């Protein structure tokens, strides 16, 4: 798959699709480092902003992690915790506070799930590691 600048699909989406395909095929295995922003830009002859946007998209999908000074790497497959909502409970997805992001070690763009129990108790769980089940 090549990046087609004449396509109606934005360049950053094309690059994200290409990288996602390589991750899903195992070409970029969990834990492996992705090429740098500069390398991807040069290899695909696209602007660095398009690379940044593609990386941000994949990060928001939970496929990759980035760290200043360490680069970008493929995340290990996440184990999801199954939470059964009890009658009278409610759940919403929202963006975490800075403190919640730090405490849960969440990547930017990953939401949290806030569950309110029938007695008003509140639980906040990482959205990329939680699956809600209705009874």
Locate each region found by the language model.
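Extreme N-terminal segment that seeds HTH/winged-HTH DNA-binding domains in transcriptional regulators
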Residues: 1-46
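Short polybasic/polar patches that bind polyanions
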Residues: 24, 42, 59-60, 102
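Beta-hairpin "wing" of winged helix-turn-helix
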Residues: 28, 32, 61-69
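Hydrophobic alpha-helical segments that drive targeting, anchoring, or assembly
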Residues: 38, 47-48, 63-66
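Residues in the helix-turn-helix
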Residues: 50, 57
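Short, structured interface segments
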Residues: 69-75
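All-alpha effector-binding/dimerization core of bacterial HTH-type transcriptional repressors
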Residues: 75-135
């Amino acid at each position: 798959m090549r990046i087609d600048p004449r396509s109606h699909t934005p360049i950053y989406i094309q690059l994200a699709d290409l990288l996602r395909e390589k991750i899903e095929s195992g070409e970029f295995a969990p834990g492996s480092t992705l090429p740098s922003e500069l390398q991807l830009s040069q290899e695909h002859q696209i602007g660095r902003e398009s690379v940044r946007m593609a990386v941000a998209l994949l990060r928001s999908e939970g496929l990759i992690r980035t760290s200043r000074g360490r680069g970008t790497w493929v995340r290990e497959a996440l184990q999801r915790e199954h939470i059964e909502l009890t009658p009278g409970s409610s759940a919403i997805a929202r963006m975490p506070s800075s403190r919640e992001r730090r405490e849960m070690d969440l990547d930017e763009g990953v939401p949290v799930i806030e569950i309110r129990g029938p007695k008003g108790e509140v639980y906040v769980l990482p959205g990329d590691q939680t699956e809600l089940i209705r009874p």
